[in-house]
C-alpha cells in the first residue's frame, strides 16, 4: 500500500510539473502574440534571397550565447571567423558583459550587454537599438541554442533579409533560416553550419 501511495505521489508531482511547464509555455506564447499585435515584435519577412549584397561591405551581426557553456563552444567554433574576405566584411558581435574576459575575436566591433535569465527585454535595449539601427545588416545570426525572448525580440526589431537561429517552438516567428540540432543534440554542428553560411 505504501508503494502505491509513493507512486501516486510521484505521478502527481510529475503531473504538477507538466502543468506548470505548460502554463509557462502558454504565457510565453501569449506574450509573443500580444507583442506581435502591438508592434513590439516585428513580423518576419516571408521572402528570402540567399545572396548577400555584392560590391558593398557585408554587414553581419552575431549574437553570442547567453549561457557560459554554449558561449565557450561558440567562441571555439568561430575562432577562425573572418580570416578570409575580412576586408569586405563588417562584423558586429553582441556578447554578455560577464563574458567580456572570455571573448577574444580580434575582428569587428563588440557590444556588451547585461542580461539576467528573468529578463524578457534586454537591459538598455533602446540604446542598443539606436546604435544597431545605424547599420543595414545583410545577415543576423543568433547563436543561442535555446530560445531567448529578449534576444529574439531585439532581432525582430532590426532590418535584415536573412535572420538565422536555432529551431524552437517560436523560431518561425523570428528566423527565416533555422538550424535543427534536436536529433543530434550537438550544438557545435549547428555552429559549423552557420560558419558555412557566413563563408558563402
Where are these regions (language model features)?
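Active-site-proximal region of nucleotide-activated glycan assembly enzymes
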Residues: 14-29, 170-200
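N-terminal amphipathic/basic-hydrophobic helices that include classical n-h-c signal peptides
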Residues: 1-19
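Histidine-anchored nucleotide/phosphate-binding helix
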Residues: 62-63, 67-86
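Short, charged/polar "capping" segments at the starts of alpha-helices
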Residues: 69-71, 98-104, 173
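Conserved nucleotide-cofactor-binding alpha/beta core module
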Residues: 82-86, 90-131
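Structural motif
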Residues: 63-67, 95-97, 143-145
Amino acid at each position: 500500500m505504501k508503494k502505491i501511495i509513493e507512486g501516486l505521489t510521484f505521478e502527481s508531482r510529475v503531473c504538477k510539473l507538466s502543468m506548470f511547464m505548460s502554463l509557462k509555455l502558454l504565457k510565453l506564447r501569449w506574450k509573443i502574440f500580444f507583442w506581435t499585435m502591438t508592434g513590439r515584435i516585428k513580423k518576419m519577412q516571408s521572402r528570402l534571397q540567399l545572396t548577400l549584397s555584392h560590391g558593398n561591405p557585408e554587414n553581419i551581426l552575431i549574437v553570442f550565447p547567453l549561457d557560459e557553456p554554449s558561449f565557450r563552444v561558440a567562441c571555439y567554433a568561430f575562432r577562425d571567423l573572418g580570416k578570409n574576405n575580412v576586408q569586405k566584411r563588417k562584423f558586429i558581435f553582441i556578447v554578455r558583459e560577464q563574458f567580456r574576459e572570455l571573448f577574444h575575436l580580434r575582428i569587428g566591433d563588440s557590444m556588451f550587454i547585461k542580461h539576467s535569465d528573468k529578463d524578457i527585454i534586454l537591459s538598455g535595449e533602446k540604446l542598443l537599438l539606436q546604435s544597431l539601427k545605424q547599420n543595414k545588416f545583410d545577415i543576423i545570426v543568433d547563436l543561442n541554442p535555446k530560445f531567448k525572448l529578449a534576444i529574439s525580440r531585439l532581432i525582430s526589431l532590426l532590418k535584415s533579409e536573412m535572420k538565422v537561429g536555432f529551431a524552437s517552438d517560436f523560431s518561425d516567428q523570428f528566423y527565416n533560416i533555422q538550424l535543427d540540432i534536436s536529433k543530434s543534440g550537438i550544438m557545435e554542428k549547428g555552429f559549423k553550419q552557420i560558419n558555412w553560411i557566413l563563408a558563402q
